[in-house]
From Swiss-Prot:
Family statement: Belongs to the PsbB/PsbC family. PsbC subfamily.
Gene: psbC
Lineage: Eukaryota, Viridiplantae, Streptophyta, Embryophyta, Tracheophyta
First and last residue of the signal peptide: none
Protein name according to UniProt: Photosystem II CP43 reaction center protein
Cited Gene3D superfamilies: photosystem ii from thermosynechococcus elongatus (1.10.10.670)
Phosphoprotein among keywords: yes
Length: 473
């Protein structure tokens, strides 16, 4: 079989350049990579690489199913989800499964079904992974040319990219169909304190959807993280799904333009670096989304956001002191600013004290008390409902903060519950993983560019300890 590899060099890096695809073994002699380099041994063995990826998918889905069932087994319906260390059930609840008004869990059976379906799926994937890793063909190019590929074949690579985009688009539309036709999703903004509802009136206006992308990422604007109604979220998924599917069809039908052929590095390691870079961006965006957004991640399931807990504390003490006779409209705090209420630089009435930094918080329990110019003093005096007091006291004592210092006052809250919020878990894990993926992106991009330029020498392996050890087998 004619290969597309240059004969420029013979170093053990990135892709083999020794002009052969006949790599029978998966050992260091034939591949240039030792056993611990994992899938690097399989760079030119498309069948075995398929097995590794399918088996990896099986492990991922097995974790999802097992962890799902573990959370179901430990779940106490009387306690809020966020007090129980759950990270999967809140996602299922947000999709509208098993919950009723106010986010109360009324049926855990859908959660059980989800766990079992994932376990069964993981068994299928696990079998497929073992089959392709051990029994299937080493390479797919000869027997299944549709699934075969050569890393330098630009046209085939963009076809594979197109297939991936179409699958992502279908995934986006699955959420749309769930929201529109299959029972709806949980809306924290539903009147009366949140409920599952079908989304009927989608936002499809491009000026609204793409307007989010043009917003500043800073306070008061918040880029796409500022989305606060489900019509926009589901409408955004219609746009995103459509773009992914049409983009996928485009990439399948076309060949890369000349500028793209010149600008990009076309090797397996380069594609790995591009993917890691994209995943890194996704991780950082997800971190901000779960930390700040209480619409896509309802506080009923994930606990309050940091700003929400801080504003809830200010609200709780405003209610208390107002009952004790304080005039919350004019009371001065220790700094000379308003103790309970003050004005933002743009003139809105906002909560005073340390929580002033979170003046742009929007939350379902607080919005009914706002007027055209921020918080409405007459509503604060006459219209506060018991459910708002209960909700804010609950959120005040469940700040997602651990024991940081400058946190809008709530770290000193003596009634706080000692727990770790799922928001903290999800935000920190996605930030850390996003950072590691970024480092991996830089590493593999550097290696891929050097290999393409022809000056990558690799690590000098003459004195490598592993070469002096007896073989594992």
């Amino acid at each position: 079989m004619k290969t597309l590899y240059s004969l420029r060099r013979f170093y053990h890096v990135e892709t083999l350049f020794n002009g052969t695809l006949a790599l029978a073994g998966r050992d260091q002699e034939t591949t240039g990579f030792a056993w611990w380099a994992g899938n690097a041994r399989l760079i030119n063995l498309s069948g075995k690489l398929l097995g590794a990826h399918v088996a990896h998918a099986g492990l991922i889905v097995f974790w999802a199913g097992a962890m799902n069932l573990f959370e179901v087994a430990h779940f106490v319906p009387e306690k809020p989800m966020y007090e129980q260390g759950l990270i999967l059930l809140p996602h299922l609840a947000t999709l509208g499964w098993g919950v009723g008004p106010g986010g109360e869990v009324i049926d855990t059976f859908p959660y059980f079904v989800s766990g079992v379906l994932h376990l069964i799926s993981s068994a299928v994937l696990g079998f497929g992974g073992i089959y392709h890793a051990l029994l299937g063909p080493e390479t797919l190019e000869e027997s299944f040319p549709f699934f075969g590929y050569v890393w330098k074949d630009r046209n085939k690579m963009t076809t594979i990219l197109g297939i991936h985009l179409i699958l992502l688009g279908i995934g986006a539309f699955l959420l749309v169909f769930k929201a529109l036709y299959f029972g709806g999703v949980y809306d924290t903004w539903a009147p009366g304190g949140g409920d599952v509802r079908k989304i009927t009136n989608l936002t499809l206006s491009p000026s609204v959807i793409f307007g989010y992308l043009l917003k500043s990422p800073f306070g008061g604007e918040g880029w796409i993280v500022s989305v606060d109604d489900l019509e926009d979220i589901i409408g955004g998924h219609v746009w995103l799904g459509s773009i992914c599917i049409f983009g996928g069809i485009w990439h399948i039908l076309t060949k890369p333009f000349a500028w793209a052929r010149r600008a990009l590095v076309w090797s397996g390691e380069a594609y790995l670096s591009y993917s890691l870079g994209a995943l890194s961006v996704f991780g950082f965006i997800a971190c901000c989304f779960v930390w700040f957004n209480n619409t896509a991640y309802p506080s009923e399931f994930y606990g309050p956001t940091g700003p929400e807990a801080s504003q809830a504390q200010a609200f709780t003490f405003l209610v208390r002191d107002q009952r004790l006779g304080a005039n919350v409209g004019s009371a001065q705090g220790p700094t000379g600013l308003g103790k309970y209420l003050m004005r933002s630089p743009t003139g809105e009435v906002i909560f005073g004290g340390e929580t002033m930094r979170f003046w742009d918080l929007r939350a379902p329990w607080l919005e009914p008390l706002r007027g055209p110019n921020g918080l409405d003093l007459s509503r604060l005096k006459k219209d506060i409902q018991p459910w708002q007091e209960r909700r804010s006291a609950e959120y005040m004592t469940h700040a997602p903060l651990g024991s940081l210092n400058s946190v809008g006052g709530v770290a000193t809250e003596i009634n706080a519950v000692n727990y770790v919020s799922p928001r903290s878990w999800l935000a920190t894990s996605h930030f850390v993983l996003g950072f590691f993926l970024f480092v991996g992106h830089l590493w593999h991009a550097g290696r891929a560019r050097a290999a393409a330029a022809g000056f990558e020498k690799g690590i000098d392996r003459d004195l490598e300890p592993v070469l002096f050890m007896t073989p594992l087998n």
